[in-house]
Amino acid sequence: MATPPYAELHCLSNYSFLRGASHPEELVARAWALGYQGLAITDECSLAGAVRAHTGLAELRRDLRAAADAPEASAQDRLLAERAEQFRLVFGAEFRLACGLKLVLLAKNRAGYGNLSALITLARQRSEKGSYRLVRADLDAISPAGAVPDCYALWLPDAASSAEDAHWFARRFGERGWLAVELHSGADDAAWLGRTAELAAAAGLPRLAAGDVHMHLRGRRPLQDTLTAIRLGTTVFEAGTALHPNGERHLRHPLRLARLYPAELLEAAARLALACDFQLDTLRYEYPQEIVPAGETPASYLRRETQAGLARRYPQGVPPAIADNVEQELALIIELGYEPFFLTVYDIVCFARDEGILCQGRGSAANSIVCYALGITEVDPARASLLFGRFISRERDEPPDIDVDFEHDRRETVIQYIYGKYGRDRAALAATVIRYRTRGALRDAGRALGFGQPQIDALARSLAWWDKRDQLPARLIELGLDPASPRVAKWLDLTGMLIGFPRHLSQHVGGFVISRGPLGRLVPIENAAMPERSVIQWDKEDLEALGLLKVDVLALGMLSVIRRSLELVGRRRGAPFALPHIPPKDAATFDMLCAADSVGVFQVESRAQMAMLPRLRPRQFYDLVVQVAIVRPGPIQGDMVHPYLTNRADPAASARTLARLPADVRAVLERTLGVPIFQEQVMKLAEVAAGFTPGEADQLRRAMASWRQKGHIERFKQKLRDGMKARGHDSDFADALCRQIEGFGEYGFPESHAASFALLAYASAWLKRHEPEAFLCGLLNSQPMGFYAPAQLLQDARRHGVEVRPVDVTASAWDATLEDLPADPDAGRRPAVRLGLREISGFPEAAALRVAEARAAAPFADTNDLARRAALQRRELDLLAAAGALQALAGHRRQAAWQVAGVCLQGDLFDAAPPPEAAVALAAPQEAEELLADYAATGFSLGRHPLALLRARLARGRFLQAAALARTPDRALVRVAGIVTGRQRPGTAQGVIFVTLEDETGSANVVVYAGLAERQRRELLGARLLGVFGQLQREGEVVHLLAKRLVDLSPWVGGLAARSRDFH
């Protein structure tokens, strides 16, 4: 029997969240493999999965075409490739109207796609995130030409549908309307065929076959049932008729369909699919134009602003090489039509600067002198020897990527400026697809299968974030569950299937899409969870696949720190102080970094970076660029760190390495001592050593970013080998280069990105070294951010001689401030840091502002005066008393609590009662009580360190102080104990976990190997005070303790509320 023609026109992917049970790519591949003529992805009121289906088909076609073009290709290979080219992918959406009517709309052409996208936008934007609402009249609201013009419509009747419904549908859509017949091997199939024939005949509607597909294979039915139960908040055993009665809602073979449907219904579906000729790659993005002044073109305005910027950047005259490069960049930007893109970013950056918001571009944009001239980036590409081809090239099939960081707590001002300038119909944030991870999958699958919440919680809590599915059986056994039990085994299977599945859309961290016309006709827009935000239904990868513009408006906490610190420095010095005022080659700053004294310093504060600093010993800015980039998985996995450090420590070894390299390769690697550290170097090596064009080199970079998932790098490796062989390089050199490229994988760090971050690393290091009080204020006032909690930042600052004064309601503002500013900024006396009321956990900013305002009018006489004039609530007074912030008004904590209890607040039941009895003199708390109260209220203490109080007990247990490790011989067996302040597990560490312990003398770095981490995971993950028995390892100035055994000493510190920043 010949395979009948068929195309599936009603198919939900897993982007119909918690409904569809297959990825769009799986559905496309399966439909093609079954011999379908086409497939429509029709997710519910959504086009979120459209690009995935589009790229899935493109990859299928590319692979089949490559096989067909191979010398050994058969006629069958060529036939398969041709059939893939003819396969029709249709874009549509399913809708349930408020009246209950169910429709599928299919885009006939570009206009129809725009109308479909606009309808989804309308339905989504009138509802809260995750829902939509559509009424019959909305179908006519999209266009005056009628009901969603240029779209075909399928009506999906149910048992309650009437002839009136059929007539309404026929009137609305006329010749564009079809009644879809959906059969799923049920006992009533024959009756339903008859009933749909009656409805169609009554309204003169044609019929076609459809499948209400939810999965590509029948085997996904258990997952589909589970998704339904999760969506409904029930179990698969209680979901009842909400579950499909069988597994027939998968892509079925056309021969099987031929036994269910009349042939003409199958043929009608195939014909309609072929009538839809819209494809996503025909979408054309149009840039905004209002940023161009009247009388100018985008090209002339960009050129004028670039030249003006160059004059500011090079006041002594633009070097000829720079001028030549600018002309080359401008010519290529104008040729590719990217001028409005650059001007859009320029406008946003100008707004931020006008508002005093610190910002800086990073990433590949730092390769561009045009970006540098416009003030978008701060790294001089000429000085840094960067590579413009990394940013823009003719061969790139996507726009350039410009990422700009803004102060993290003022970025919303920038976001609202963009919405205000372009309107919410033309600007929206890109989406981020939130996918299931192990714990979430475990919890949802467990609930859907009816497991008890205690069992689910116990298993989820026993997992660490790094645990994979193959470690679940061991966790189950620990909890007394049998992994071989059918029900438990099903739990594990479903958990594994859920991992990586999309669950819902969220908003991108800052990727804006801005268009000239209505954005909702390009991609659907929906409301974000955050107020005043809107989000498109496509994510970053979708936008890149279609070559659509995205402006990244990102948040960076260190910019907030630096801006706040610079303001305080200016106040202390009596004159404005900005980034350009920081001396660029300060020896004391580099001395500090070489000693790994970098707590709080941007990018070099992690334990891995601290371990590298004394080995690399940065003495100039470019050394910092390397420092930022080298402690990354790419250089580590590519085995580049040790050779670089060896060559840096031994100039003769470096000279020998460089001498062995061909001259063209030597020119690329000379600055990094013969070792490739940056992505740009890999790209340039491909050009000079293997003859790649700049565009091909950029394609290599992109393949490096995804080779682990997609294996795209293999074809480039062969091209590299062939190109190097043709240029006389031996095979050993070619193999070594390929190994290094693979090592970079998705973790290669661009030099342009490292240079941008190194600027901020140096600025923050200079502030720490020369203005530590202002820097501490900046760090505290910008929390949460960085690797360290306020407790560790305060400990470090005080060890550096910074005087820190406690939170005090008679002196503290909301933020930390400087006190005792000397009249002469060069005087030896330093200012003190007064902690802000923000440090009191739970104390509201509004209350702090009232306190400051009332205090500015007159000092507080007592707690009653404070409560009355600052209009404080009972809970706010209690928080101040518990934090010791009423010391100046009421004395110690117990006395303050007593006084606060006696304060009569306006509106209290007894606010007219007589004055309370005279205050009772209460004994002051003991030191340990004060310590516990400090940590409970603020997370830190300015008193003695908790371990100072325990030192005698620790000494009896032969636990060394952290400072003593520096004097301890290599390989010595020692014991150390400390408050856990951080746990880290780098992706390249092969299961090793790095733990930071703090005591009264400093920090100890502990290395816990994977085996011990698994055996003692409870102690490792749960201890607040951790004892470690281990062997000391010394490499130069770097000291680590290799753990042999862990002991949870937390009972020794009672209820101490110490906070650790884990796996940050």
From Swiss-Prot:
Catalysed conversion reaction: DNA(n) + a 2'-deoxyribonucleoside 5'-triphosphate = DNA(n+1) + diphosphate
GO BP, sorted A to Z: DNA repair; DNA replication
The entry's keywords: Cytoplasm, DNA damage, DNA repair, DNA replication, DNA-directed DNA polymerase, Nucleotidyltransferase, Transferase
Cited InterPro entries: DNA_pol3_alpha_NTPase_dom, DNA_pol3_finger, DnaE2, DnaE2/DnaE/PolC, DNAPol_HHH, NA-bd_OB_tRNA, PHP_dom, Pol/His_phosphatase_N
Family annotation (Gene3D superfamilies): 1.10.150.870, Metal-dependent hydrolases
Family in the record: Belongs to the DNA polymerase type-C family. DnaE2 subfamily.
UniProt protein name: Error-prone DNA polymerase
Organism of derivation: Azoarcus sp. (strain BH72)
